[in-house]
Amino acid sequence: MITWVGIDDTDTYDKGCTTYVMYNMLKEFLKTKGEWRIITYPRLIRLNPNVPFKTRGNAAVSVGLNVDDPREALELAEWAVDAYSHKIGKTSPGIVVSISNNEHWIYWKALSDVIPLNAAVKWMSKLGVIYRGGRGVIGALASVMADLSQDSTLELLAYSESTPKPSIPIDLVKKLNDSTTPLTFENVSGDYVLIQPHGNDPVIFGIRGDSPYHIIHFASMLINEVDVEPRWLIYLTNQATGHHLNSIMNKPYTTGYVEGSVNEVRLVQGGNIEIRVNSTHVFSYRHYGFKSIDKATYLIAYGGFKPGVNSLDLYMEGGVALMLNNIVKNPRCPRCGSNLESTGRVGLLKCPKCGLITGLPRLMNYTSEFTLEEPREAEVRHLHKPTARIGLEGLVNVFNRPSLWII
């Protein structure tokens, strides 16, 4: 019987990793079960990035297992959470076990809205889903019900419990990035390595991409260089898909969209920019590196809505800035060809060379340009879809799961 297991909220803001709980759960499962009993890749699902309460990575994990009884999967998940989670502070681990995973509307709602715990419990009771724990069941349920049929990406996460974390050489990362792009992405930004987290967790690096073979090659070269025991797991993810933009809610703590003429632009604390578009205040953080929004005359922006003083404020994640410039020129003299000048009287122009006075209209020249506003690679949120991925949607589905998906 195929049974889906979801886990969330097992880490704190400074320790632990929910993906490591899944890694150890699968390694334990494989001690007594064949690999064929694990249905495709485990899944790493990022949730609504705008909710005020979320785990450090704001992600839940899930996997499909072929077991004789769903209680077997539940017991395995409970063991892994007890052994590898950090239940301190605001951590509220949750486990979900379901024999179906096709209630995709739950996934889309978890990406775009705020789901109360009592609503999730009501849905699970109605669907016959087994659950244990606290607030983490919301993300766990969303991960189980994730819809990755149209687009998904992969991430290989390598683990080590040794401290300190090994140093990853920037030159090697750049070389591997150049040889695997565009089938891997978000590896490096200038001289800054993006693949290594700096928190107190067992993840030593994560390689994202659309081809399992390219990310395995990338990881193998790094493992050889940093000289640690190879331990990794490849996840199927919704990262870099832009799934959170599929539903625009325009209410607090949801993804929002604003379009209109720019009425005011001003610098606020920290060098950030506040733009008034119609009646909405749009905020752009300086470190995002948006290029031209301070010059925009018309702006299309998307991001997260948060309550403002009198209305909703949009915190910009990306968009399009349009710059319109109106250039007014005096025409040339129809008699001698010199540039006409103003006479100081409305509507009249005078030629400084031949003295002709004329009522010829001034020439209006319109110029326009637009820029696609994307954050710097080092500031990209997990769900943000980079332009480099356009045209690669669904490519993951072309490849079979390689034998080295877990080691």
UniProtKB/Swiss-Prot annotation:
One of its GO terms (biological process) is tRNA wobble cytosine modification. One of its GO terms (molecular function) is ligase activity, forming carbon-nitrogen bonds. Its EC number is 6.3.4.22. Its main location: cytoplasm. It is found in: Cytoplasm. Keywords: ATP-binding, Cytoplasm, Ligase, Nucleotide-binding, tRNA processing. This is tRNA(Ile2) 2-agmatinylcytidine synthetase TiaS. It comes from Caldivirga maquilingensis (strain ATCC 700844 / DSM 13496 / JCM 10307 / IC-167). The lineage of its organism: Archaea, Thermoproteota, Thermoprotei, Thermoproteales, Thermoproteaceae.
